[in-house]
C-alpha cells in the first residue's frame, strides 16, 4: 500500500471529532466532510484532508454580525451567513468542492511537495474554468470583472471564496440554472459585495462596516431567486401550457438574453428593483429579447438563406443555359460550352444577380416583419439596422434592374453587341463587384478561419462596428470557425457532393425538360375540355410540369449527402479499425495479443507515452502497431508467471463472471471461456478451453506425419501455433499431476509413475524423445488417457474401472512405447515394475479418487477432459449471440486508438444522471403472469425469445438450491422478477448497467495499487471464476450490507475478495450515480410499488443516489418544494436523507425531462456527467474503458478540446420481429456511421439524446445539459448540442466504447416516436438556436448542419409534396385536355419525369436510409452478410415500413410548423407481440396516412380514367407505380406489421369494434379510445391554437379538393361537351341539394326517430321518391346517363370533404349555430365510416385469402423463425406444456 493510503486507526464508539468539537453527526453523501477523523476509505487520501483544510482557512476574515461564529465553520459557512444561503446548499457545495479539489490535486503531475496542503494551481485552474463564462460575459458587456485576483499575487482563499460563491448561487438557483447569464449578473453583483466585505469597506449610508444588501435566513432564495422565478412562472402561465404563440410570451432564452445587454444594470439594479418592467408579466413588460419565434415555413429560408440562394441561382443559370443550348451531334459538354460562349447567354446569366438581390430583400423583409417586436427604446439600433437592410436590398434591386435594362436597350439600339453595349455590361459588372464585397470578405475569412474567430471573439467596439451590418450583436455564436485542417476536410466533402448534385441536376433534371417546355409554351389552339381562365396561355401548365422537378431539385442534396457520408463513414471507420474482430473465430486468432492489449490500454503505465509532442505520439503509434499485429517480443507471448498474465486473467475472468451473472453464458461455457488459475504445476499460460479445442489432436497428427523427424523439428512445428504448444504442455503437465494425485503417495505404483515421467522429462531435455519413444503409438496412449480422464471426471465411477484403464496404460507405456524393447529385468532396474509382480495386480489398492466435494480438482479434470476430447472447432462458444457480440466488440475495441488509462486515483471523476418519472422499475409478479388476449404472458414471451438465457437462469437457480421450477414463484421470486426486468426497458436494467462503472473502478483501483506479490497471490488464490453465486465482497469495511445471493448489486465478484478496503473509497470519489426520480416523494407517500423497488435498488447499490422533489404542505393551501437527495445507509439499514434544498416553487415550468435533470444536477459530482436515459444499459467490459474515454478531455480534437464526448450505442431491441430489426438497423447506422461522419470530418455533431459525456463544469456555467422552454424545446437534448456549438464547444464521437439502448419495437410505438422527433424538429425550425447556427456557421458546416437536422425532415416532406405535385399536375393536364393535345407522345417529358420519379422512389423505398446501414454492416460484419441482410429486409417489406415512416415524419413536421401541437408522446417500452385493433390503428393513422392515401388513390383513379397516357399501360405503370406503392404502403403497413393482422376472426371483431367506436355516444369523461366524437375533436386541437396565418394556409391547402369537382363535371354526359363556367356553377346546386336533404333527414331523425318513428320513415321514403323523380327527369330532358352518378361521386365526395375541413377551421363561430355544427359532426362521422370501410376492404380480403396470415407472420417474425424460436406459439397463443 502506498503512502497515499495512510490508514486511520479504527474507531470504537462515538467519532473523536464529534466528541471534541460537538459537531452533530449528519448523514453524508460520499465523504463525511464534517468528520475528517471518521473511519472512511476516502479520508485516507491526504488530498481530501488538504481540500477540507483549505476551506477552513477563514483566518482573519471579518465575522458575520448577528450570529454566533462557531469554530468548525469554514469559508462556505462564512458566505452563507453573510448572503443568506441555505444550510443544506452549503453542505452540498462543501462536499462538491472538497471532492473536486481533492480529485484535481490527485491528478497533479508531478505531485506537489506538500501533499497535505492544497496546491494553489489547483484552485486557480478551477476558478478559471468555472468562471470563464462570467469573464467572457463581462468582456462582452464592457464591464470590469469583479474577480479581484492577479496572477502575480495569487490568493487561494479569495479564489475559494469566488468559486464557493458561484457554486452556492448555482446550487440554489433552481430554474434559473437554465439562464447562465442571469446567474452571471447575480454573481457579478454579489461578488462586488463580497469584495467590499473583503476590503473592509464602509457603508456609505451608515458608516458601518459594509453588509450585503440581502442577508438572513433564506435571503438569497426569497430576495433573488424567487422574484425571477415568479416572472418565469407568470410567463409560463400566460403561455397556457405552451399553446399560445411563441411570440406572445417570454421563454427561458428570452429572459436570459435580457442579460446580454447592459440595460440589465440600469433597469434591474442591485438589489433587484421589483418595480422594473422586467418583472411584469402583463402590460408594459420587456417582451421578447434577442429573437422572436413565429410559426411559418419562411423561417427555413430565414435560417438557411445561403443554401436557398445557392440552389435558386444555379437553377436559374441552368435553365438559361439549357434553354439556349443548340442540339447537335457534339458531346453534351461541347454543347454546354458552346451555349456559354454566346454573349446573349452570358448577359442573361447576369439576371442571377437580380434574383440574388431579390432574395436579399426577401430576407430583409422577413427579418423586419418577424423580429419587429424586439424593437424598443433600448434597441433603436436594431430597428435602424433592419430598416437599412430593407432599403439597401431594395436599392440593389433597382440598381441591377436599371443597369440590366440599359444593356438590352443599348443592344437593341445598336442591333448588335457593340462597344457601347459592352460598356453597359462592364457597368453592371462593377455593380456586381460592389455587391459581392461582403461575400469576398466572407470567403477570405473562411480561408483564414483564425482571423474570423479573432474578429468575432474580440470585444473591441471597432470590430463590433465592422460586423454590426452583417450580423447582429450576440453573446453566443462567436468564434465558431474550425481549424484549417478540419476546414479543408469538410469543404472537400461538400465540394464533391455539390459538384455531383449540380452535374446530375443539369444533365438529368433541367436539360430534358427544356424541349417539352418549349413545345408546351408555344402550343396554340389547345382543345380545352373545361372553362379555361387563362385564354390560350399555357404558362400554368408549364409551371405544373416543372413543379415536381423543382421540388426534387431542391431536396436531392439529401440523397447525395447520404451516398457520400456512407462512403466517408466507411473510410473513417476503417482508419479507426472498426470491425477487424467480427466474431469468435477472429478473436481466436488475436487472443494471444489480447492480454497485451488490455495491459497497454486499460492498465496505467509509468512512462512518457502520455506526454505531448510528435515524438511521443510516434512512439505510441509504433507501440499500437506492434500490439495490433503482434510484432515484437512484448506483444507475442505471455508466460504463466508474468504479472501481466495474472492481471489479464483477473480482468478476463471478471468479465466472464459478469456474463454468467447476466445469464448469457452457462456454467459449462464459463469453464470453456475462463482463464483458470495456475495449478497442477502447469508451466504455460492456461488459455481458455475454447482456444485449445482440437489443438492436441492436430499436434498428434503432426507427430504422426513427422514420425522420423528429430525432436527439435517436431517441437518447432508444434510451437508455430501458440495455442497448440500450450495445449500440449498443459495436457502433459496435467496428466502427470492427475496420475500422481489419484495414486496413493507411498505406493510402488506412485514411484513407478514418478520414474516414468522422469524418463520422459530427461528425453525431452536431451532432445531424444523421438529416438526413445514410438511417436506412432501416441494416438493409442491418447485414447487410453481419454478413457481414464473420462472415468475420473465421472464422480460416480467405480475405482475398479479406473484400475483397469491404468493397467492398460501401463502395459502400453512399458511394453510398447519404448523404441528399444526392454526386458522385465531392465524395467525392474529402472524402477518401472513392482518389486514383487506376482504378489498383486498393479494399481489394485493404490487408487484414491478425491471426494466429490473437491470442486477445484474436478474443475481441473473437466478442463483436461475438454482439452483431450474436443474435436469440433468450438466456434459456437458461447452460444448466446449477445455474449458473442460483446466479446467481439470489446476485444476489437482494445486494438483501436484510445488514450492511455491513468490510475483510478488520477482519473477524472464523473457522474451518471438518469431522469426517471414513473416508468417500470422491476416487473411485478402480476405483470409477469398477466396474459394478453392471445393468452401470452410477459414471462412466457421472454422465455421464448431468450430461451438460452432462461435455461442459464434456471441452471443458476438450481445451483443456488431450488429443486423444482415452481420454487421460482416463491423462494426465488425476486430473482425471477429481476431476470425478466433485465430483458425489458426498466430502471433496474439501467441501474445494473450503470453500476458496472462502480464495480469496474473498484477492480481497477485494486489492480493499480496491488503489488506484484498481491497480484500473483490473488491469481493463485482465485485464478478462476469459482464463486458463481455472487456473494458480496468487502463487507468488512461496512459499506455493503449483508445481502442474499440473488443480490442485484454488481459489487459481487471473485476479485472483490482480494480488496483491501481503499478501493471502495477510491471508486466512490470517482463515480456517483444519480437517478432523478422526480415524484419519488409522492410515490412513497402513496406506497406505490415503484417506491419500494427504487428503495431496493438503493439498498443493493451503494453508489446510487436518488434525487426527488418533495412537496411539503405549508398551510393556507400553500406548498413548499424541496430538492432532496437520499441514499440507503447500510449501517442504519434504512433510507437516509442527505440534502434538502428549498426551491422557489414547482420544478416543472418548462418541459418535464430537462426540469427533472436540472433539479438533480446539483447533486452530481466530478469533472464530467454522462446522460443516460431510462431505456439504456451498459456492460462491465465497457465500463473498464471509461477512464480512457475521460482522458479525451485532455486531447485537442481540431483546435479545441472536447466539451461533449460522444459515445457509441448498441440497439438491443432488434432481435425478434422484422419491424424491430428495421428500426434497430436504422438507429444503429445513425448512432454509428451517422455520428462518426458528423464528428469527423463534418464537425457538426450535436447531442441527440445519446449517452454522451458532458464536461460538467463547462456546461454547469453555460445553462446546463438541456433546455427546458415549453414546446419550443420539446426535443430538449439536441439543444444542449446547439448550445454547446454556439458557445464555442467541441463535440466528438468515440467508438471504442458503447452502451446499450432500447428502441420502440411495435409500429404504433415507432410511429409515436417518429411523430415526437418530427414535431421536435418542426419546433427547432422556429428556434433561435437553429437560426444562429444557420447564420454563424461557415457555409459548408451550415450545409452539414441543415441536412442532418431539420433539413432531413424538410426534405422528407418535400418528397411527399413531390408526389402531390406530380399527380395533381398530371390530373390537371389530363382533365384540361392539354395532355391530349401536346404531351401524350413527348418522350423527353417522360424521360425527365422518369428521373425525378426514380429519385423520389429511391427516397420512398428508404434506400438512402438503407445505404448507411449496408455500409455499416459491411464494415463491421462483412460485405456479403450486409448484402444478404439488405435482401432479407426487402423480402420482409422494409420498403413498406420506410415509406410509411416517411409519411409520419412529413405529416407531423409540417403540421407542427404550421399549427404547433408538438407534445411529449409516451411511446411505451413494453414487448409488442399482441394484435392491435383496427380502431386503434385508425385513430393513430387516419389523418396522417389513411386519408392522404385515399386522396392519392382517388387522383390516380381519376388520372387513369381520363388520361390518354393511361391507354398505354406500360407508360402508365411506369409513371404511377411509385405513387401506387406509396398509397398501398400508407394503407396496409399498420396491418402488415400487426401480429395476426390478417386473421379473419380478428378482422371481423375489429370491424365490429370500429363501428361501436364510431357510434358511441360519449359523456364528458369519455376518452378518445372509446368515442369517435371525442377523438374527432382532439384531432382538431392544433387548429384551435394556430394563428390566422396557419388557418389561412390550411384553407388554401384544402381548396385542392374542389378541383376534383371542377375537372370532372365537364367530363359528365350531362354537360354535353360544354365548357361554360355555368356548368361548374350549376354543379354546386347538387352539393347544396344534398346538404339540404341531409339537414332534413337529420332534423327528422332528431324529432321523430325516437317517439314517432313512422314519421321518420315517411320522410325518408318521400326523399327517396323525390330523388328517383329527379333522376328520371334528368334522363328524360337532359344528356344525363347512369354512369354520371358514379363519375360524379369522384367529384362531390372530395368537395364535401373539403367543405368539412374548412368548417373545422371555422369551428369557433360555427359552434354558435347548433344545427349547422351538428350537421358538420354528422357528415364527419359519415366520412370516417366511409374511410374505415375503404381501408377495411383490402384487409378483409387478404384475411379471407387462405395462407396469407401465415405468410404475414413469417414476414413479420422471420428473424425469430431463423433462430428457431417458438414464435408461432406467441402469435397464436398456444403454450407448450411445462412452461413456468
Curated annotation (Swiss-Prot):
The UniProt record lists the keyword Glycosyltransferase: yes
Enzyme class: transferase
UniProtKB keywords: Cell membrane, Cell shape, Cell wall biogenesis/degradation, Glycoprotein, Glycosyltransferase, Membrane, Transferase, Transmembrane, Transmembrane helix
Cellular location(s): Cell membrane
Its EC number(s): 2.4.1.34
Molecular function via GO: 1,3-beta-D-glucan synthase activity
Listed GO CC annotations: 1,3-beta-D-glucan synthase complex; Golgi apparatus; plasma membrane; plasmodesma
Record-annotated membrane-spanning stretches: 303-323, 349-369, 387-407, 428-448, 490-510, 543-563, 1349-1369, 1395-1415, 1422-1442, 1490-1510, 1517-1537, 1589-1609, 1621-1641, 1658-1678, 1682-1702, 1729-1749
Catalytic activity: [(1->3)-beta-D-glucosyl](n) + UDP-alpha-D-glucose = [(1->3)-beta-D-glucosyl](n+1) + UDP + H(+)
Protein's GO biological process: (1->3)-beta-D-glucan biosynthetic process; defense response; defense response by callose deposition; defense response by callose deposition in cell wall; defense response to bacterium; defense response to fungus; innate immune response-activating signaling pathway; leaf morphogenesis
A Pfam family hit: Glucan_synthase
Inactivation phenotype: Plants develop smaller leaves, and collapsed and inviable pollen grains. They are resistant to the biotrophic pathogens Erysiphe cichoracearum (powdery mildew), E.orontii and Hyaloperonospora parasitica.
Membrane topology value: Multi-pass membrane protein
Glycosylated sites: 1712
Annotated tissue distribution: Highly expressed in flowers. Expressed at low levels in roots, leaves, stems, cauline leaves and siliques.
Extracellular side: 324-348, 408-427, 511-542, 1370-1394, 1443-1489, 1538-1588, 1642-1657, 1703-1728
Family according to the record: Belongs to the glycosyltransferase 48 family.
Role: Involved in sporophytic and gametophytic development. Required for normal leaf development. During pollen formation, required for the formation of the callose wall separating the tetraspores of the tetrad (interstitial wall), but not for the callose wall surrounding the pollen mother cells (peripheral wall). Functionally redudant to CALS11 (GSL1). May play a role later in pollen grain maturation. Required for callose formation induced by wounding and pathogen attack. May interfere with salicylic acid-induced signaling pathway during defense response.
Name this polypeptide is given: Callose synthase 12
Organism annotation: Arabidopsis thaliana (Mouse-ear cress)
